[in-house]
Amino acid sequence: MMRTHYCGSLTEAQIDQTVTLCGWVHRRRDHGGVIFLDMRDRDGLVQVVIDPDTPEAFATADKVRSEFVLKITGRVRRRYEGTENSNMVSGQIEVLGKEIEVLAQSETPPFPLNDDNINISEEHRLKYRFLDIRRPEMLDRLRFRSKVTNLIRNYLDDHGFLDVETPILTRATPEGARDYLVPSRVQNGSFYALPQSPQLFKQLLMVGGIDRYYQIAKCFRDEDLRADRQPEFTQIDIETSFLNDDDIMDLMEGMTVKLFDELLGIKFDKFQRMPYSEAMRDYASDKPDLRIPLKLVDVADLMQDVEFKVFAGPAKDPKGRIAALRVPGAGALPRSAIDEYTKFVGIYGAKGLAYIKVNEIEKGVEGLQSPIVKFIEPIVMQLLERVGAENGDIVFFGADKAKVVNDAMGALRVKIGHDLKLVTCEWAPLWVVDFPMFEETDDGKWTSVHHPFTLPKSSVEDVKANPGEALSVAYDMVLNGTEVGGGSLRIYTLEMQKAIFEALGISDEEAEEKFSFLLNALRYGAPPHGGLAFGLDRLIMLMTGASSIRDVIAFPKTKTAECPLTQAPAPVEANQLRDLGIRLREQPKKED
C-alpha cells in the first residue's frame, strides 16, 4: 500500500501517528520560510506543513506546484490555536511533513481547480473532464451517486430482487423516441438497436419465473436534448410478479424514503396519490410541483355566451380550455412584469395573457383593473367568486386549445411561484395515477400515453369499443415537479395485447414481425406483473441540487449529443464502412 490514510479522513484521532498520504497539491503557500501544502484526494483536504528542519523535504516542497501528485509521510499534530478550519473534516489537525516524493508533475491546468467562484464554460469543463472531476464539488456528486446506487442495490437485494443483465444489442421497437442503430457486419444490411429501455426483456424475465428483477441499466434515446436529458442515461429498472400496483408503489416509495432519510436526513410522510385528471385540472401538468400553492380553475362554462372571441371560441370548442390562475396578494405586479409573463407564455404557444387586478371587489366592476373587464362584464363577478378572488389579488387567464393552455398556464404557475417566493416546503413527493391509456394524434389516430404493453383498467371489449375512455394501471413518481420514476402493470394475456395493438393501428402482421417473441411468451403462461423505472441521473440531480444531469454524470454529452473530451461522434475509416456495406450520401452544402 502506497498510503496509510486518505487526506480527508484524518481527524484528531490520528494525532501523534505517522501517516503516509498520496494525492494532488490543491494549493501551495509559502509563509515566512514555512511551506504549507493543501493535499487533496478523493476524500477531501488536509494541510501539510514543511519546515526547514527537514531540508530534503523542504527543497522538494519548494519546487512543487498546484496539481503535482505527491506521496508525503509525516506526523499528525493538532493545529495551533486560532489556525483551525471548521470547514474541513481535518480542520483541527495538520501533518508535519518529513518525506516528500513527487510521483508526477503537472502543467498549469487550463482552469483553476481550487476556486469554485471562477466562471468556467461547460464546454471547457467537459473538454477537460478528467480535471473537472478533481474539483471537490464534482467528486462529492460522484461519491454521492455511488452511495445512492449502493443503497438501492442493498434495498432491492433485501427485498428479494435479482440483479439480471439484459442485452445492449437488440432490435428496434416503437418506444416513442428514435433508436440508435448499430449496423451488423455479419448480417449485412441489418441493424441492431441500442435499447431505449429493457422493457420487453424484463417482461420476458417475469415469464421466465425470475419473479423480482432489477438492473441499473444504460439506456439510449436519439432525441432532442434538454437540461435533464442525455442520449445515454442510466435507469434503475425494476419488475415484479404477483404484486398489484399498490404493492409496487409502496415498495418503491419505501426505497425513496430510505434514500432521502439515510443520505440527506430528510423524512417523508406517506406520498400523496393524485389522479391524472386532477393533476391536469388543478395544475395543468401530469407532474405537478406541489410546493407551489397555486391552482388553476376551469371557467369555460361561464364564458359560453360572452361576445369576446378570445374566450368564446375556446369555451365552445370541445378541445378547448379556459383556465384562471389566482395569485393572492400579487395585484401590485407592475405592467412590466405582466408583459414579461405574456412573453413567457408565448414560448408555449399562447397568443396572449389576459388578467384582472382586484383592487376593491366590493365596488364591483369599478374596483377592478383590466383591459378585458368591459368584454365580460355580465359574468365577471361570478368569475371572481369562483376563483375565490380577494382584494390585492391578480387573476391570469389562459384560453386556447387545451394543450396550449395546459403547457402555458402550467409553466406560468411554476414561474410565478418561484418569482414571488411562494414555495412552501423543500420537498413535495407524490404519485400521479390513473393515466389515460391512449391519446389522440392530430390525424385522429390513437397513440400510447406510456407504452403499448401497459395494462388497461378496462376489459378487452371496452378497449375495443371506447379506447378514448380507457384508463391505464400506470403510476409516475413526481418530486418537486420532476418525474423521477414511472411504471405500470403490464399486459399478460395474448388477447389483451392484441386488442391494444389493434387500437394503436398495429396490424397482426406488423405485431408478429416486431413483437413475435413477446406474443410467443404470452402463449405460455405469463404471470401478472408490473414494474417501474427510475431515472438515476435525474434523481441524483434533484438530491444534490445540481442544475443539470450533466453535472452528476462522469462523462456526459453536450446538448448537441457531442463529447468535447473524445470528439465523439466522429467520422470512421472508409474500409470500416465498406465492411458494413454502408455508403455515405453526400450532404448538400449549406448556403452562407
Swiss-Prot record:
Residues noted as binding ATP in the record, renumbered to the chain: R221, D222, E223, Q230, E483, G535, L536, D537, R538
Region ranges (Aspartate): 199-202
Entry keyword set: Aminoacyl-tRNA synthetase, ATP-binding, Cytoplasm, Ligase, Nucleotide-binding, Protein biosynthesis
Documented EC number(s): 6.1.1.23
Enzyme class, first EC level, given as a word: ligase
A GO MF term: ATP binding
PROSITE patterns: AA_TRNA_LIGASE_II
Localization of this protein: Cytoplasm
Site (Important for tRNA non-discrimination): H31, G82
Gene Ontology terms: cellular component: cytoplasm
Residues that bind L-aspartate: E175, R221, H450, R490
Entry-linked Gene3D superfamilies: Bira Bifunctional Protein, Domain 2 (3.30.930.10), GAD-like domain (3.30.1360.30), Nucleic acid-binding proteins (2.40.50.140)
An example Gene Ontology biological process: aspartyl-tRNA aminoacylation
Pfam families assigned: GAD (PF02938), tRNA-synt_2 (PF00152), tRNA_anti-codon (PF01336)
PANTHER family: ASPARTATE--TRNA LIGASE, MITOCHONDRIAL, ASPARTYL/LYSYL-TRNA SYNTHETASE
Quaternary assembly: Homodimer.
UniProt xrefs under HAMAP family: Asp_tRNA_synth_type1 (MF_00044)
Role noted for this protein: Aspartyl-tRNA synthetase with relaxed tRNA specificity since it is able to aspartylate not only its cognate tRNA(Asp) but also tRNA(Asn). Reaction proceeds in two steps: L-aspartate is first activated by ATP to form Asp-AMP and then transferred to the acceptor end of tRNA(Asp/Asn).
Protein family per UniProt: Belongs to the class-II aminoacyl-tRNA synthetase family. Type 1 subfamily.
Protein name per its UniProtKB record: Aspartate--tRNA(Asp/Asn) ligase
Phylogenetic lineage: Bacteria, Pseudomonadati, Pseudomonadota, Gammaproteobacteria, Moraxellales
